[in-house]
Amino acid sequence: MQIFVKTLTGKTITLEVESSDTIDNVKAKIQDKEGIPPDQQRLIFAGKQLEDGRTLADYNIQKESTLHLVLRLRGGAKKRKKKTYTKPKKIKHKHKKVKLAVLQFYKVDGSGKVQRLRKECPNATCGAGTFMASHFDRHYCGKCGLTYVYQKEGAQE
């Protein structure tokens, strides 16, 4: 019997087949005529893709039926190489919780009066409770950048 195969370009080719022929045989005949390897061919009939091991009779393909030939798309993206790091991973800093740590900012003098050891930043943007870092020659606020430099004794102005 004779069947038609419509290719991607719209060209229709005729094939002489038997209803007992497998889809593999049909693909081999298409390769002979068109030069397309069977592993890249996909044959569609009545909206279904034809599987290689089955026969034309399994799909009820009769004489003068038209099969549609489309090419197989090899999907997926290129495999990505695993990154190799030159340096070992940096260990994350673990916060140490110290109980009653706030006590280091205050001192109780002999009369029982509480005295602040660190200078508090007077800037309005910092808010209450922001202490200034005390360096050997200055007080510095890390939040707003305000700096008070100590006046050295005997220094000329």
UniProtKB/Swiss-Prot annotation:
GO terms for cellular component: cytosol; cytosolic small ribosomal subunit; Golgi apparatus; nucleus. GO terms for biological process: translation; ubiquitin-dependent protein catabolic process. Keywords: Cytoplasm, Isopeptide bond, Metal-binding, Nucleus, Ribonucleoprotein, Ribosomal protein, Zinc, Zinc-finger. CDD domains: Ubl_ubiquitin. It holds the Pfam family ubiquitin. Residues 1-76 form the Ubiquitin-like domain. A zinc finger (C4-type) spans 121-144. PROSITE patterns: UBIQUITIN_1, UBIQUITIN_2. One of its GO terms (molecular function) is mRNA binding. There is a cross-link at residue 76 (Glycyl lysine isopeptide (Gly-Lys) (interchain with K-? in acceptor proteins)). Disulfide bonds: none annotated. The keyword Ribonucleoprotein applies. In the N-terminal section; belongs to the ubiquitin family. Ubiquitin is encoded by 16 different genes. Ubiquitin is generally synthesized as a polyubiquitin precursor with tandem head to tail repeats. Often, there are one to three additional amino acids after the last repeat, removed in the mature protein. Alternatively, ubiquitin extension protein is synthesized as a single copy of ubiquitin fused to a ribosomal protein (either eL40 or eS31) or to a ubiquitin-related protein (either RUB1 or RUB2). Following translation, extension protein is cleaved from ubiquitin. PANTHER family: UBIQUITIN (PTHR10666). This is Ubiquitin-ribosomal protein eS31y fusion protein.
